[in-house]
């Protein structure tokens, strides 16, 4: 079974393992015992309707959530207890396979909880979540510390019979065993008790961190007519309050980026910059620094309890990087070139500011503004001109075209009202095999920013595919925070936001292309799972997309060849800034999780560490520590934010495989290998082995340096 994030799921990891479609479940494989869910709570009900059943988003009522969580936890624990106390000797079928079907009510519930957490958050939900976090942590700990269950898993792993199983099934067993062992299943009684205490407190802290940052993200800045200098008309229209001459700037990246790029009001640029980068760092009730210090201390203690020198060593053991040293070495290979390039970029910007007699020294709130001037001067490339050809609806259709050519998928809007949605903004498409018409899954899109929706962009899998107990198809969503345009107006996006749109669609395609037999292998290794999404960004400015979909929103004319050429020549423009802001966050994440954090002051540590590394004063970390939700609102990316760079080595190398092929980025042979080896298997194959099967060798790190313009 697949788990989503109610707290951070040890239960989630519990069943996160399994083989691909082609490996049929044995005929005598038992199903999990019927869940003792006896209430009529709609959040626990089996999904009904078309497409193999869909979430009942139209029946979501927060009043049902708290009792549903408690009932689902009890049901899952009861199911696992039946497996643990089975009088028959442990086998792959009656233990590992049986666990795959346990907790389905919790799976369904976590989809709704995820919506309330990320898409429709309210103070009431956040209060409820805080109340439930310790209970959920105790539930997860009870699973991991079920000695009888772990003994059965261990017996299956040590059984001579395992050697006769397929490689996929062996991997499934190993992953399930490792999940338990790495979460303290082998600790003594005192160790288990302390582990449970740490888990319970971390659950509270992660939840509180996310709530505090979200509260700061709900702050806005009101602008008057005198504050709009330099802003594009489309942006002004998007943020204008309809009933007054007031423009409201949300505290989101999708609003901050264009404001800092175009606003001629330097004082306001600084205000907007400080508001965005000070989230969680105002010294008020929403300040997160004390939470971070405690989170780091507890993670460090837990790692020591499990026998590791620090949290990062524990976290990276089963990643592609394997050790913090290897992850750090990759980042430090890129860092000198990145900060050297920043110096060149700042010099070019300062030259323009001096020529304009601006009387300033470039500061962080000036970087985007003057970088845009450099872009226009060097490449005669105006990013707002590019934006006129990047219409969200057309970009969506372009993604569908790419998915058709590479994956053989077709996307068709579902009939209005046939699939429940949780907000009127959400639209749904059916995904089919273009050649056979066979149903593959559903794709949901929630594109617009609104109060209660977390910032950024992300993909969510509501249901992963598997075949071990009958074919189950995928339900996956993409979520963005575009500012909704006035009715009847097109939504124009920046090139960066268009790239992110493609990126998140890559995650969706990874889910849709899965061919695993057991849902447990639908998971992934963190420093590998960003590879597929980062790779899909490369198709945004391919000829097929440019010629067919990047058309001027008013004239319908295709993007001029001269503009295309400027975009390609400027492909590595501002790479110093983008690489440095990312590496600042990734290196800080790793550093925080390798030191002994006793007595740490996160703000002071951030300042001192950046100074030690020679962080340019004109660039700030992409995610400063006080609002680094990837790392502190849960453990998904903790000690793992480097994974984007690790994945980008694979991305750059794989992109060269397409560039070298006769058919370029749409070469059918390379596309077939891509899907077969790097998308469809999910976690059924070790990522390093999967990449070698695709490329015939390991990825070349120099491909990354070439790609970023850092090659010698």
Language model segments and positions:
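Bacterial N-terminal signal peptides
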Residues: 5-16
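N-terminal helix-rich structural modules
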Residues: 13, 24-26, 30-235, 247-248, ...
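Bacterial signal peptide processing site
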Residues: 18-20
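C-terminal, non-catalytic "cap/extension" segments appended to globular domains
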Residues: 29-64, 71, 230, 234, ...
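Short His/Asp/Glu-rich catalytic/ion-coordination signatures at enzyme active sites or charged loops
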Residues: 49-66, 113-132, 155-197, 250-290, ...
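A broad, structural surface signal
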Residues: 63, 67-85, 97, 101-104, ...
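Active-site-proximal, well-structured secondary-structure segments within enzyme catalytic domains
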Residues: 172, 204, 211, 215-250, ...
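Short pre-active-site segment immediately N-terminal to the catalytic Zn-binding motif
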Residues: 483-502
């Amino acid at each position: 079974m697949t788990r989503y994030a109610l707290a951070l799921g040890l239960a989630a990891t519990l069943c996160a393992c399994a083989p691909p479609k082609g490996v049929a479940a044995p005929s005598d494989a038992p199903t999990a015992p019927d869940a003792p869910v006896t209430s009529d709570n709609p959040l626990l009900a089996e999904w009904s309707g078309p497409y193999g059943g869909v979430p009942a988003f139209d029946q979501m009522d927060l009043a049902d959530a708290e009792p549903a969580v408690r009932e689902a936890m009890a049901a899952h624990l009861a199911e696992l207890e039946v497996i643990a106390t089975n009088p028959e000797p442990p086998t792959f079928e009656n233990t590992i396979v049986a666990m795959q079907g346990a907790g389905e009510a919790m799976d369904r519930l976590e989809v709704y909880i995820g919506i309330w957490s990320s898409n429709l958050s309210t103070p009431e939900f956040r209060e409820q979540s805080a109340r439930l976090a310790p209970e959920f942590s105790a539930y997860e700990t009870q699973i991991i510390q079920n000695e009888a269950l772990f003994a059965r898993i261990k017996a299956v792993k040590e059984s001579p019979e395992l050697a006769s199983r397929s490689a996929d099934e062996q991997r499934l067993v190993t992953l399930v065993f490792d999940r338990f062992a790495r979460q303290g299943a082998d600790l003594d009684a005192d160790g288990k008790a302390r582990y449970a205490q740490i888990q319970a407190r971390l659950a509270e802290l992660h939840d509180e961190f996310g709530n505090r940052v979200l509260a700061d993200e709900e702050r806005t800045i009101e602008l008057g007519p005198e504050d709009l200098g330099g802003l594009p008309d489309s942006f002004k229209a998007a943020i204008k309050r309809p009933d007054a001459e007031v423009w409201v700037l949300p505290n989101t990246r999708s609003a901050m980026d264009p404001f800092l790029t175009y606003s001629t009001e330097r004082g306001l640029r600084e205000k907007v910059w400080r508001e965005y980068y000070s989230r969680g760092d105002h010294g008020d009730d929403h300040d997160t620094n004390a939470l971070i210090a405690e989170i780091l201390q507890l993670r460090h203690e837990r790692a020591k309890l499990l026998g590791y020198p620090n949290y990062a060593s524990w976290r990276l053991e089963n990643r592609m990087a394997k050790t913090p040293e290897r992850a750090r070495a990759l980042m430090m290979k890129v860092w000198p070139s990145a900060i050297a390039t920043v110096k060149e970029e700042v010099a070019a910007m300062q030259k323009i500011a001096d020529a304009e007699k601006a009387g300033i020294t470039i500061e962080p709130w000036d970087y985007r503004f003057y970088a845009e001037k450099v872009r226009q001067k060097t490449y005669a490339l105006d990013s707002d001109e590019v934006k006129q050809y990047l219409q969200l609806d057309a970009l969506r259709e372009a993604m569908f075209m790419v998915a058709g050519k590479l994956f053989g998928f077709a996307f068709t809007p579902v009939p209005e009202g046939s699939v429940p949605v949780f907000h009127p903004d959400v639209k749904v498409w059916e995904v089919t095999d273009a050649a056979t018409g066979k149903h593959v899954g559903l794709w949901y899109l929630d594109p617009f920013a609104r109060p209660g929706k977390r910032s950024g962009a992300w993909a969510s899998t509501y249901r992963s595919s598997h075949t071990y107990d009958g074919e189950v198809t995928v339900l996956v969503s993409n979520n963005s925070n575009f500012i909704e345009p006035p009715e009847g107006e097109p939504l124009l996006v920046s090139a960066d936001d268009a790239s992110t749109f493609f990126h998140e669609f890559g995650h969706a395609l990874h889910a849709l292309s899965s061919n695993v037999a057991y849902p447990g292998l639908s998971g992934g290794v963190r420093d590998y799972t960003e590879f597929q999404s980062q790779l899909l960004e490369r198709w945004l400015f391919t000829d097929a997309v440019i010629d067919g979909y990047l058309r001027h929103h008013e004239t319908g004319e295709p993007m001029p060849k001269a503009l295309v050429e400027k975009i390609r020549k400027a492909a590595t423009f501002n790479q110093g800034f983008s690489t440095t802001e990312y590496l600042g966050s990734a290196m800080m994440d790793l550093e925080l999780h390798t030191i002994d954090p006793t007595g740490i002051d996160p703000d002071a540590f951030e300042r001192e560490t950046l100074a030690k590394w020679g962080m340019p004063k004109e660039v700030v970390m992409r995610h400063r520590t006080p609002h680094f939700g990837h790392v502190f609102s849960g453990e998904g990316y903790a000690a793992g934010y480097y994974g984007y760079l690790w994945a980008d080595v694979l991305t750059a190398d794989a992109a060269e495989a397409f560039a070298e092929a006769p058919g370029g980025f749409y070469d059918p042979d390379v596309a077939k290998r891509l899907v077969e080896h790097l998308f469809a298997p999910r976690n059924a194959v070790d990522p390093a082995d999967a990449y070698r099967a695709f490329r015939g060798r390991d990825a070349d790190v120099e491909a990354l340096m070439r790609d970023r313009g850092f090659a010698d």
